[in-house]
Structures are given as C-alpha cells and as structure tokens.
Amino acid sequence: GVYPPGTSVELSNGWRGTVAAITPGNLLQPKIAIKEDGKTKIVDLSTEKLFIKRSLDEQPREEVDFLKDAE
C-alpha cells in the first residue's frame, strides 16, 4: 500500500520507524526514519532490500466502517 508521511511502520527486518518522505513516481518505496541509539537514520527503501511489512497506526474509523460494509 501507499503510506503517507508520518505513518508508523514495521519493516521486513523488524525495524520500526516513520515514513519520512515519499518520492513521486515511486510511492511504494518511501524513505523511513529509524531512531537508533538516540540518532535518526534515514532508510531509503528504493535502495535497500527491505519493504514495509505493516502499518503500526490504527486504520481511520471511516476506512474500518467502509471495510465492514463491504463484507
């Protein structure tokens, strides 16, 4: 999926971070800010062999209601 900046995510290697930036034309491989040892490291998914495993944020209420109605 597409994750807007500010979304908390878990990467395929277990790291957790926040979507920092999206590159137009490459929405599925954003830059992720990872906090490690008190420092922030930027991981560019377009150059790393990682992917977003899941969002750590709850789905917006409207999205949950829409999905329930579709069942």
Please provide the spans of the model-predicted regions.
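Terminal helices and disordered tails flanking the catalytic cores of nucleotide-processing hydrolases
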Residues: 1-71
